[in-house]
Amino acid sequence: MKNMKSVYDGCSNTFTYDRPAFVKEPETTTTTAKPTTTTTATKPTTTKYTVTGTLPNARVKASKSNYDLRIKLPSGVTSYYLEDKYTSRQLFMSCAGNYVSHFNNASNRYAKSSMSGFTVKYNSTKKRTYVYVKASSSYRGYAVSFDNGYAYIKWGTPKTMYKNILVLDAGHGGSDSGATGNRLREKDLTLSIVLAAKKQFDKDKNYAVYYTRTTDTYPSLTARSQLANDVGADYFLSCHINSASATAKGSETLYNSQGYKATNGVTSYKWAANVHNFTKAATGFTNRGLVNRTGLAVLRHTRTASTLTEFGFITNKTEAASMKANTDKYGKAMFNSVVKMFQTNPSKR
């Protein structure tokens, strides 16, 4: 055999072999695999905001890529109230708690566009912080979005920002009582009707509604028309109560045949006819129809489709009592007339 030597031993008659050296097998190393750890990326938490108030829906949206003013919000505050305080040309924002120092800190806001004012107040009674943003001395519409700790605010002319614009006028007011009869004053009835309509509009943000008055004040006739012209209203609606003899009765609606059209081409006559259908249905009074009145200031100077509706006669005892009891019903009828008009005749914006 290869690598073996044979030796004969004469005494023992024994063969002895030189055995080859033992070859050690290579060691096998066993490695225990560590369990694989899977790392899942944590998605950033998205803050949810609760927004209430009467600010209308805007056709132009505010976002972190489209804004005029960016405001850093206080940490942990996620509920806000928004309102267009157009009489003072301001956007109003409020939240619970005292954050005056936070909002007054200039480093917490950044303006891409110039603005007329930024004011912060604390209401100790309601325990809320009030923020007033004044974009301009002229009327402005606003859009606001809340995203990841910031409020983004966009503004522009009302007709740029809002799709459906109405001016609602409560006739008379202040020192001008209007017609009187049966212990009632026209200015009180018209205001009650308009405020009832406002309750409906406040719940539907598809409409930007400007009111000539919401308290017992007297805006001039010029101011009423000018409001509609300044905001670029689609429609103007003035609420009134008639007066004559004790036997006069019925509902009628006035229009100006020489007046302006709405932005979508609707005439004052068509607008008046729409409103009158709701007025007469709500009152149930005698239908006196549509009346052409070219001399009325608010119908002559308003540069859009405009109408003035007379619900009934304050001098008629039966109608006066009915009107006093049904202002909420009439207000809802005015709301429904506006909704119907915009649905059947959308604005061109």
Report the location of each language-model feature:
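Active-site histidine-acidic residue metal-binding/catalytic motifs
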Residues: Y150-L227, V231, S257
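Short linear recognition/processing motifs and adjacent strand/loop elements at protein termini
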Residues: M1-L166
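A short, glycine/acidic-enriched catalytic loop
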Residues: D176-L184, A244-N274
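Extracytoplasmic/secreted envelope proteins and their assembly/folding machinery
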Residues: L191-V194, K198, T222-S225, S251, ...
